[in-house]
Structure formats: structure tokens, C-alpha cells
């Protein structure tokens, strides 16, 4: 078992130290608060990503509309036709 680069023996040591520091009554409360904070952070990151994708799609659609609305102008090079008769 390897979570965040921490193996099982390290996790046990961390839990024992946390149990000694906070006590058995506060440990579940702290775990619950930590879990809620992590879930809130994930939800915020997901919302940010969705908003970013939505704006990128909106910008792409705007660029497609503006490029399809204006047709490129045709340019004719007249100088090559007049230079062939100078020999």
C-alpha cells in the first residue's frame, strides 16, 4: 500500500503520533474535517476546470464564426505577366 509516496509502516507511525497528540476522542473529528476540506478542494478544482473548458470552447466557436464569415480575398500578381514581354 503506497499513498502519496507513504508506505504502510509510515502510515501506522503517523496514526500513532496523531492518536497521542489529539487523543482518541478528537481524532475522528479531525479526520472528518480533513476529508471535508479535501472534498471541497476537489470540487473547486473541478469547477475551475469546467469553467476553463467552457470558456475555451466559447472562444474557439467565436474564432470559427469570424473566420467563416469573411472570405479570403483573391490576389492576382500582375507583375509577372508584364515582365515576360521585356526580352
From Swiss-Prot:
One of its GO terms (molecular function) is protein transmembrane transporter activity. The chain crosses the membrane at residues 3-23. GO terms for biological process: protein transport by the Tat complex. Its main location: membrane. It is a single-pass membrane protein. One of its GO terms (cellular component) is TAT protein transport complex. NCBIfam families: PRK14857.1, PRK14861.1, tatAE. Forms a complex with TatC. Part of the twin-arginine translocation (Tat) system that transports large folded proteins containing a characteristic twin-arginine motif in their signal peptide across membranes. TatA could form the protein-conducting channel of the Tat system. PANTHER family: SEC-INDEPENDENT PROTEIN TRANSLOCASE PROTEIN TATA, CHLOROPLASTIC (PTHR33162:SF1). Belongs to the TatA/E family. This is Sec-independent protein translocase protein TatA. It comes from Trichodesmium erythraeum (strain IMS101).
Amino acid at each position: 500500500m503506497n499513498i502519496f509516496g507513504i508506505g504502510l509502516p509510515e502510515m501506522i507511525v503517523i496514526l500513532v503520533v496523531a492518536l497521542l497528540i489529539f487523543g482518541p476522542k478528537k481524532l475522528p473529528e479531525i479526520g472528518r474535517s480533513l476529508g471535508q476540506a479535501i472534498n471541497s478542494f476537489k470540487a473547486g478544482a473541478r469547477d475551475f476546470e469546467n469553467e476553463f473548458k467552457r470558456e475555451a470552447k466559447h472562444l474557439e466557436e467565436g474564432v470559427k464564426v469570424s473566420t467563416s464569415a469573411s472570405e479570403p480575398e483573391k490576389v492576382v500578381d500582375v507583375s509577372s505577366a508584364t515582365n515576360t514581354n521585356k526580352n
